[in-house]
From Swiss-Prot:
Phosphothreonine modified-residue sites: 219, 245
Low complexity bias: start-end ranges: 329-339
Post-translational modifications: Phosphorylated in mitosis. Can be phosphorylated by CDK1, CDK5 and MAPK1. Phosphorylation by CDK5 promotes interaction with KATNA1 and YWHAE. Palmitoylation at Cys-273 reduces affinity for dynein.
Region: Interaction with NEFL, residue numbers: 191-345
Gene behind this protein: NDEL1
PANTHER family: NUCLEAR DISTRIBUTION PROTEIN NUDE HOMOLOG 1, NUCLEAR DISTRIBUTION PROTEIN NUDE-LIKE 1
Gene Ontology biological process terms from the UniProt entry: cell differentiation; cell migration; centrosome localization; chromosome segregation; establishment of chromosome localization; establishment of mitotic spindle orientation; lysosome localization; microtubule nucleation
Interaction with CENPF as annotated region, ranges: 175-345
Self-association and partners: Self-associates. Interacts with DISC1, dynein, dynactin, tubulin gamma, KATNA1, KATNB1, microtubules, PAFAH1B1, PCM1, PCNT, and YWHAE. Interacts directly with NEFL and indirectly with NEFH. Interacts (via C-terminus) with CENPF. Interacts with ZNF365. Interacts with PLEKHM1 (via N- and C-terminus). Interacts with GTP-bound RAB9A; the interaction may lead to RAB9A-dynein motor tethering.
The name this protein goes by in its record: Nuclear distribution protein nudE-like 1
Segments of this protein annotated with the region Interaction with KATNA1: 195-256
Region of interest (Interaction with KATNB1), residue spans: 64-189
Length: 345
């Protein structure tokens, strides 16, 4: 109002009307201000109530949040402790697992080495098995040959027995022949004195032939076998009275000599057979020892036969060299296996 210029009034009525109008204006402004104040106060109270309610809610929420915060702090502490505990347990488990892993790797390496050793041992055993099979096959072959040879020797032993009987019979016949020859010589001495000169020469030739036959010359075996069965008319039985011709006597003496040589050869073969039996027993023990040593040592090497005399060469080692079979006796016999002694005599 101080700032406003008061106009100049010409009359009091104008001044009064002016001040009334101004008072009404201020009154209206006051009324508006009071209404605004009342409205502001009401709004302030509402706002205050609302703010108080919000404050209460905020405080409640703050308390709840603080409680939640405290609970979460406790949970965080518990989780930290649990995490530390889990971490310690995990570290221990990792350490244990690492130790187990290292031990497992070591065991795996050992198992690999053991498997390689087993494979090598298996290969050695297979080689030893093959060598043993070969040795057993060789041994079976030699055993079969030895059995065959023993069968041949048994047959020859039987033949030897029959030959011994024949030799004894021929010895008896030779003794009888010698006795008869002595009688004939005495008779020839008697007749030589009374006979002419030409018969004397014939008798001398006959005497030389008889003396040669008595000395048992080494005649061929073929002749002995050809003349081993002369006619019954020429051979006396020891009880008859028919005389023997000189050729028959010589053949009989040759047969006796051949039979004696056969008996000697059979005795040599028997000695060789005994040596073979001894060598077979020692070789069997040697082979069994070598087979056991080869399987235990897993060397798989076949024992060498060099340096050992085969039992088939025993005849040559013992100095026994059998004669070839005669054409009359050896033609019907089966051939012996290679390396074996000839069985015919």
């Amino acid at each position: 109002m101080d700032g406003e210029d008061i106009p100049d009034f010409s009359s009091l009525k104008e001044e009064t009307a002016y001040w009334k109008e101004l008072s009404l204006k201020y009154k209206q402004t006051f009324q508006e201000a009071r209404d605004e104040l009342v409205e502001f106060q009401e709004g302030s109270r509402e706002l205050e109530a609302e703010l108080e309610a919000q404050l209460v809610q905020a405080e409640q929420r703050n308390r709840d949040l603080q409680a939640d915060n405290q609970r979460l702090k406790y949970e965080v502490e518990a989780l930290k402790e649990k995490l530390e505990h889990q971490y310690a347990q995990s570290y221990k488990q990792v350490s244990v697992l690492e130790d187990d892993l290292s031990q497992t790797r070591a065991i795996k390496e050992q198992l690999h080495k053991y498997v390689r050793e087993l494979e090598q041992a298996n290969d050695d055993l297979e080689r030893a098995k093959r060598a043993t099979i070969v040795s057993l096959e060789d041994f079976e072959q030699r055993l079969n040959q030895a059995i065959e040879r023993n069968a041949f020797l048994e047959s020859e032993l039987d033949e030897k027995e029959s030959l011994l009987v024949s030799v004894q019979r021929l010895k008896d016949e030779a003794r009888d022949l010698r006795q008869e020859l002595a009688v004939r010589e005495r008779q020839q001495e008697v007749t030589r004195k009374s006979a002419p000169s030409s018969p004397t020469l014939d008798c001398e030739k006959m005497d030389s032939a008889v003396q040669a036959s008595l000395s048992l010359p080494a005649t061929p075996v073929g002749k002995g076998t050809e003349n081993s069965f002369p006619s019954p008319k020429a051979i006396p039985n020891g009880f008859g009275t028919s005389p023997l011709t000189p050729s028959a006597r010589i053949s009989a003496l040759n047969i006796v000599g051949d039979l004696l040589r056969k008996v000697g050869a059979l005795e040599s073969k028997l000695a060789a057979c005994r040596n073979f039996a001894k060598d077979q027993a020692s070789r069997k023990s040697y082979i069994s020892g070598n087979v056991n040593c080869g399987v235990m040592n897993s060397n798989g090497t076949k024992f060498s036969r060099s340096g050992h005399t085969s039992f088939f060469d025993k005849g040559a080692v013992n100095g026994f060299d059998p004669a070839p079979p005669p054409p009359g006796l050896g033609s019907s016999r089966p051939l012996s296996a290679p390396g074996m002694l000839p069985l015919s005599v």
